[in-house]
Amino acid sequence: MDLPGDSSTPGRQRLCRQPHAGALWGAKSPKRPKLQPLGAPSPLEKASRRVLAVVLEDVMAARMVPLEPQEESSTPRHHSNHRDSVRSQPPASPPRQAMWSPQARPPDPLHLCREPLSRIRRPPSTPRRQSRTTPGPDEGPSQKVDQVHQPTLVVMLQDIASSRPRAEGFADEAPNFIIPARRAEPKVMVHQPKPPSRDLPAPSRPSALSANPLASPPPAPDPVLEPPSTPPPSSLLRPRLSPWGLAPLFHSVRSKLESFADIFLTPNKAPRPPPPSPPMKLELKIAISEAGQPGASEGTVTVSPRPPIRQWRAQDQNPSATLTKPSLGRSHSCPDLGPPGPDPCSWPPVPAPSSRPRPRRHTVGGGEMAKAPPPPRPCLRKEVFPLGGVGASPPLVTSCSSTASTSSFSEPAEPRLSSTKRKEPRAPEDQVLPDSETKTIGKVSRFRIRRTPARSQINLTPMGLPRPVRLNKKEFSLEEIYTNKNYQSPTTRRTFETIFEEPRERNGTLIFTSSRKLRRTVEFRDSSLPRSRRPSRGARATAGRTLPPSLAPSPDVEPLLQQRLQELDASLLEEEEEGDQDQPHRT
């Protein structure tokens, strides 16, 4: 389908952007191979090329301004036994001002052709393509062509390389370079015949196309902005020395080509693991400082860790370094920090508190708050020594080592040396006590560990309550029985026939005995003896089988049994004899 205003001959070949391998690809080979050979594009690649063609068509359609094409005259040239045609279009009429709107686009996208706006050097009418596995740069265009013809997406861009002002109709003109898209598929090569030596461009190629020399031939000048005289064919192939005018558009189209090719032509990539984040280092430094005297704020304070006890004792014996320092009345397990001084390596003595009030920072109150004594210094560890007090002896103050200025923490022996002096009065007490007592005082070793569990007490109930104490007596008088606190008079339902039973009156008559069967004798067992346990059900069953010895037959009963058996036998014999005598009478 021709563009609007096309007056060219119907048999003229056109530059078409169509992704299907149809009209222009099989000129040399009339029949397409049925089987897909090695190196042929896969269906995924074909689909991606179609998508690229549609996207580029939408991008460039709004900026395309068609010209009325002129008649062409072709001059044949022979190079490497192949024919290349150079078209020349003399502009016979001024360009039209009508824009090609998107509504006037041809309905058939498969045969969409865009006429070039200039006399450009076309690729050969039957471009040769060869699929190979390892493309080499030294491959000549005269090499024989493979039978497989693959469609290549061709984007036509043209640079308006002229310093003259543009015509009004070319305000939105799109560039027209012939750029084969070979971004993501290195196996598909486009071979074009080289121009003769006399037509080679003298100046260097532009910087925009130098990165892709095989895919972008040199552009052609614009014939519309030139004088109407027909230039020689050699000048048509030579680019002009002028900057590129539409380089940003070219880069945008190229970036879209690359992005679509990366999406549709690259295989699935394994997800890369995120780069390992650098480990976080948390450093917590706690410095205990106090507001010093006015005028000494420019000094620095260094906090020293707790020195070992051996260092305290070693320096405790050196009285030359002792200086008076008032105690602050706080826990003696934390170091005593002096005020900052000009020398960071020494701990100057603290002067005695003067009578004048000490100025306090960040206070808005009156003189009462200013006269109040300063609070004790903060303590990081809560340890209290029993012998430490407020009025104890002053601690020792020494100078730090010479390496304190280079290190972050110095180690003076001053902290908590007052506690060592407070421990001195306790030393003679420890010497008076023997070694055996000092080892056992306040230790767990003095408690004996029982190897066997303690026996449970008998006079306790299962709940742990004490049992009532009973007298070990076998005979009780009636007074003791009835005066016992545990005695209760029998109720009407629970009455016993005793000598003290009171008669009850029923229906006007006195009843001395009850109608219930009551036991006349009561056996009082000794309470000191343990009660006999009731036999279990299994024991009762076994006891029923074997007679107890009290119920066992005595030897006197045996002759009685024998006599009884003999009597039974005699009676049986008599009955038999009587039966024998009655039988003959019946016969």
From Swiss-Prot:
Provenance organism: Bos taurus (Bovine)
Chain segments carrying region Required for nuclear localization: 519-536
Keyword vocabulary terms for this entry: Acetylation, Chromosome, Myogenesis, Nucleus, Phosphoprotein
Gene: PRR14
Compositionally skewed regions (Low complexity) per UniProt: 200-214, 398-410, 538-548
Residue positions where Phosphoserine is found in the record: S277
Polar residues bias (residue ranges): 1-11, 314-325
NAD found in the keyword field: no
Compositionally biased intervals (Pro residues): 215-234, 337-356
Protein name: Proline-rich protein 14
Sequence segments annotated as region (Required for the interaction with GRB2 and sufficient to promote the phosphorylation of AKT and cell proliferation): 85-378
Region of interest (Required for nuclear lamina association), residue spans: 136-365
N-acetylmethionine modified-residue sites: M1
